[in-house]
Amino acid sequence: MLERLGLETALRLLIRRFQHTHGARTQYRASPPREHLPRPAQEVIYRVAQECLLNVAKHSGATSVNLSLRSTDKKIRLSVRDNGAGFCADQALSKPKSFGLAGMRERALLLGGTLSILTAPGKGTEVTLDLPAPVVLNGKNSRIVD
């Protein structure tokens, strides 16, 4: 779907499906990158958004979710914030079955990016993905080419 529709449309469809299925009020704001993003960067952004929404549906009980995609000359940032139950991030990351959180972080690292999780029990969760622009592969200063 991502390859056929492009990142912006794929994200909007993902969010629409999430809203329809789970009923949480969902806002999406975007200032898409000025340049075409390489396919690996688009995939990471989409998969992190998808995993965040899946986690909201499975664990948080949130009634409101805000997603934003912003781009500057130095970075591309995806932020997903909810008003749900929150959790203890250190405990969740150390669990043997926390493949989703670990997978998101691994995807970010592969492109020289970072993934941060700001949460606490009862306080909701904010997941922030930062990818360098131009996106780099494995921390090396080289562009990824489609």
Descriptions of predicted regions:
Residues 1-146:
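Coiled-coil dimerization/phosphotransfer module
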